[in-house]
């Protein structure tokens, strides 16, 4: 068996096209332009690149992009004052604070200062709680992207056995909540799970988000299962730096029914879902119907 390759890059392009279409209609019918504000503190190179990509794609779908680049010495009071202004700005529908923040800033305090309705990363404690209790919320972008791809590939997920390897607040826990919301039977596993391979082999859906390069091999996978690899790891191989996932793609692809590659799988969906969340936030703020197929 050779697994179907789930092309996240192409899927993300489709999501962005849907977002752009909805944005154009919002402008034409209601005179509204969804606005996304991104706050970057410091000069972390990876964050600089990521923020640049977010801004570019925001403009490409017709949204307004507001970038706030602050020095690494910015005080907590200054950052909170900026967030307060963005919370009250009617042109801003989504706010994203790029993590990690410099060590002198309290990330939890900063994230929870956001208006939950504008928290397009879905990290505010209110959104976390609402997701966990099955209420309407802003959903973290990476798990939302995974869910979109699973729905597209498998259709109805009800009754399927799902194993999420990883228990982070950013991916593992919200991914499990989303799968529960689809009526899957969900197991959360992690690096200390006893006989992890046996647990994973029970999964119709296997989501790897443990942060260990190529930890999940073909021996962990039930024949025909759908494997979503969230991992992004840089390793040295043959004298070169290579980007790999948490899944050993070569061995897994011989067993799985479908699998996301790294790169080109889950990664592109994260920014696409950020744009989708910003669109959703704009619609909610203005009492308009939410876009179908772009939310959980």
Curated annotation (Swiss-Prot):
Instruction: Kindly tell me the pathway this chain contributes to.
Output: One-carbon metabolism; tetrahydrofolate interconversion
Q: Which domain of life is it from?
A: Bacteria
Catalytic activity annotation: (6R)-5,10-methylene-5,6,7,8-tetrahydrofolate + NADP(+) = (6R)-5,10-methenyltetrahydrofolate + NADPH; (6R)-5,10-methenyltetrahydrofolate + H2O = (6R)-10-formyltetrahydrofolate + H(+)
> Any idea which GO molecular function terms this record carries?
methenyltetrahydrofolate cyclohydrolase activity; methylenetetrahydrofolate dehydrogenase (NADP+) activity
- Provide the disulphide bond pattern: none
Q: Name one GO biological process term.
A: L-histidine biosynthetic process
- Gene Ontology terms, cellular component aspect? cytosol
Q: What is its EC number?
A: 1.5.1.5, 3.5.4.9
- What PROSITE patterns does the entry give? THF_DHG_CYH_1, THF_DHG_CYH_2
Instruction: Please verify whether the record's keywords include Oxidoreductase.
Output: yes
Which CDD domains does this one have? Answer: NAD_bind_m-THF_DH_Cyclohyd (cd01080)
Keywords in UniProt for this one? Amino-acid biosynthesis, Histidine biosynthesis, Hydrolase, Methionine biosynthesis, Multifunctional enzyme, NADP, One-carbon metabolism, Oxidoreductase, Purine biosynthesis
Q: Please give the subunit comment from the record.
A: Homodimer.
Its function, per the record, reads: Catalyzes the oxidation of 5,10-methylenetetrahydrofolate to 5,10-methenyltetrahydrofolate and then the hydrolysis of 5,10-methenyltetrahydrofolate to 10-formyltetrahydrofolate.
Give the record's family classification.
Belongs to the tetrahydrofolate dehydrogenase/cyclohydrolase family.
Q: What is this protein called?
A: Bifunctional protein FolD
Q: Which organism is it from?
A: Cereibacter sphaeroides (strain ATCC 17025 / ATH 2.4.3) (Rhodobacter sphaeroides)
* Gene (UniProt): folD
